[in-house]
Amino acid sequence: MMSGRRSWPAMATVLLTLLVCLGELVDAYPAKPQAPGEHASPDELNRYYTSLRHYLNLVTRQRFGKRDFSEALLSILLFPDREDPPVKSRPEGAYLW
């Protein structure tokens, strides 16, 4: 019975720490710009579109790593001896069954 009482404060501490960490991650993500009203001036629209373009560039920026390989580079890595790897729809030769 005592082990149940001791684990409760530890569990509460872990949950609070997790909430603080998640709060920090939310603050790191850029906020979407607020759209101006229907009767906005051209200057306000220009500022909005500039900030929207900046926001979209941040959110959709290219990440380097696994997805950076092009198909040509991947085929060179997979088939270093051949220029064009042959495409076979089924294996040639005698069937095993």
From Swiss-Prot:
It is found in: Secreted. Its main location: secreted. The modification Phenylalanine amide is found at residue 64. Keywords: Amidation, Cleavage on pair of basic residues, Hormone, Phosphoprotein, Secreted, Signal. GO terms for biological process: feeding behavior; neuropeptide signaling pathway. Residues 1-28 form the signal peptide. CDD domains: PAH. One of its GO terms (molecular function) is neuropeptide Y receptor binding. SMART domains: PAH. One of its GO terms (cellular component) is extracellular space. Pfam families: Hormone_3 (PF00159). The modification Phosphoserine is found at residue 41. PROSITE patterns: PANCREATIC_HORMONE_1, PANCREATIC_HORMONE_2. The keyword Nucleotide-binding does not apply. The keyword Secreted applies. It comes from the Eukaryota. Residues 68-97 form a propeptide. Belongs to the NPY family. This gut peptide inhibits exocrine pancreatic secretion, has a vasoconstrictory action and inhibitis jejunal and colonic mobility. This is Peptide YY. It comes from Bos taurus. The gene is PYY.
